[in-house]
Structures are given as C-alpha cells and as structure tokens.
Regions:
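Single, function-defining residue in the core of a domain
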Residues: 1-181
Length: 181
C-alpha cells in the first residue's frame, strides 16, 4: 500500500513536506493510515538514536576494540549515553513535561541545581525558562555546558552539543559527589 501525507498550512516561502510511504500492511481506513505515519515517525527516532551512537556524537564506529565481548560492553555503555542524549534532544522544547529523574539520579539533580546560577545570566532571556526538575530544565543546563548560548532565538542544541555538555556534566557531578569526602 502507498500512504501519501502532505503538510497543510505551510509557512510562507517554504515547500510543503510530502511523504510517500510504502507498506506491506493493508491500509483500508484513516486510522490505519495514521498508524503507518506513526510508525514512520518512530523510525525517525530510531535513526537519530543510531546516528547519535555512531556518527553524531559517540563515534562508536571509531572504536579500535577487536574483542567481541569488550565491543558489546562498549556498545551497551554508549547506547545508554545515546539514549540520554536523545531524551535531552526530545525534551529541549519543554512540551513533554517529563521529570528529570528519568535521566538523572538524585545526586546528579543536586549538581544541576548547584550549576544553574552559574549558567544563567542576569536578564530574563538568559534564564532557564523551564520548570525546575523537568527534563527540559535539565536539558537547558546540559546544553549550556555543551556550549549552547541559551538564547531562545538561537538554533536549538543538537546531539553533539548535548554529548559535549553531558560529558562535562558527568565529570562535574562526580566532583560534586566527592566534595565532602
């Protein structure tokens, strides 16, 4: 079956998005059409995950490990990091309202709180616009650590910015945990 989906209300000056999707499933009504579109949309997330894992951040393919067992362990660790990065990318706009605890532990959350005053500027435009303890709030902090300027008119942070920010954050969080040792 062929499913064709075209964007309506296209912004001025932009061409409408048109998808032509081939499926082996019988598409006999609108509900099934939207189910096929939903599957395609999920496929995009999966492709983004593997792009983050391999090329756009963690460079798993650059590993020089030759032992299969070690490569499997590295892949598992990298997959967890890629998953967190993708959660941050998807939460950055604040629409999901997800809790930061789905990606960060309580000690890491304390570190996020401690870092926030250092990352926010003096004006309202330079402050984290998201409710505290949400994943969008945490994503804003991680993106700032990754080099994003934080202004609403700037290009939104992507996987590479989040990878840099998350790597830096993990080091800071480890140091924060050791502060009372």
């Amino acid at each position: 079956s062929l499913v064709e989906v075209c964007e309506v209300d296209t912004p001025p000056g932009a061409e409408p998005i048109a998808w032509r999707l081939l499926t082996t499933h019988a598409v006999e009504d609108a509900a099934m059409t939207w189910r096929v579109v939903g599957w395609y949309r999920q496929r995009w997330h999966i492709e983004q995950f593997f792009r983050t894992l391999k090329q756009q951040g963690l460079q798993l393919e650059d590993s020089q490990l030759e032992n299969a067992g070690r490569l499997i362990k590295l892949t598992a660790i990298a997959a967890r990091a890629a998953c967190t990065i993708m959660q941050l990318v998807q939460a950055r706009d604040g629409r999901s309202g997800q809790d930061a605890r789905i990606a960060f532990s309580l000690p890491e959350s304390e570190t996020l709180h401690a870092l926030l005053p250092e990352l926010e500027g003096k004006t309202e435009l330079q402050k984290n616009p998201h409710p505290p303890e949400t994943l969008a709030w945490a994503a804003w902090i991680i993106a700032k650590l990754g080099g994003w300027d934080g202004y609403p008119k700037s290009k939104p942070p992507g996987p590479i910015t989040f990878r840099h920010g998350l790597q830096y954050f993990k080091s800071l969080a480890h140091g924060w945990r050791l502060r009372n040792v």
